[in-house]
């Protein structure tokens, strides 16, 4: 499964350079140069990491950090020219996970990205939830050691829910993350796949949030 990163940087040259470097490392990168656009993208998609500048048009990095952190625990790396103690302390007080000042070495940035992803579990070789073991590299799910006959889409939906355990994912987020931006289907597509997925699981671990979406409980 690909790792998806939201990159928010208003300097076009830096933004393009970082995006290209991360893409070369096989990360999927959504890049934007405006704070308001970043806000929209964050709620329309699911990301395993956010790289966030502070000085941005629209909402600034500190505002976005507070907003994003109030929603979930997605790792957030601040990437900014502001090297003073006050801005760093402010960011860490708002629960930023790391803080990198410009200029920086691209290889060091990549190592910091890898460290945050490893710490969050996004680079895990397997995920365990209840009686299930998910193996992302092989798109396989085992229940008490026995493989379940999930389709590729069913596996991707289950993994997405596991990676966001405790967070409600809307129909729109699931559609865009699993089927992509250009998919013409609607919420019924998600509903059908969830129904089929539930029928193959040993117990109903997927909770429906009526009118919103689906969630895996944090306690699993």
UniProtKB/Swiss-Prot annotation:
The keyword Repressor applies. Residues 124-218 bind DNA. The modification 4-aspartylphosphate is found at residue 53. GO terms for cellular component: cytosol; protein-DNA complex. Residues 4-117 form the Response regulatory domain. One of its GO terms (biological process) is cell wall organization. One of its GO terms (molecular function) is phosphorelay response regulator activity. The keyword Cytoplasm applies. Keywords: Activator, Antibiotic resistance, Cell wall biogenesis/degradation, Cytoplasm, DNA-binding, Phosphoprotein, Repressor, Transcription, Transcription regulation, Two-component regulatory system. InterPro entries: CheY-like_superfamily (IPR011006), OmpR/PhoB-type_DNA-bd (IPR001867), Sig_transdc_resp-reg_receiver (IPR001789), WalR-like (IPR039420), WH-like_DNA-bd_sf (IPR036388). SMART domains: REC, Trans_reg_C. May be phosphorylated by VanSB. May also be dephosphorylated by VanSB. It holds the Pfam family Response_reg. It is found in: Cytoplasm. Member of the two-component regulatory system VanSB/VanRB. Activates the transcription of vanSB, vanYB and vanW in response to vancomycin which results in vancomycin resistance. This is Regulatory protein VanRB. It comes from Enterococcus faecalis (strain ATCC 700802 / V583).
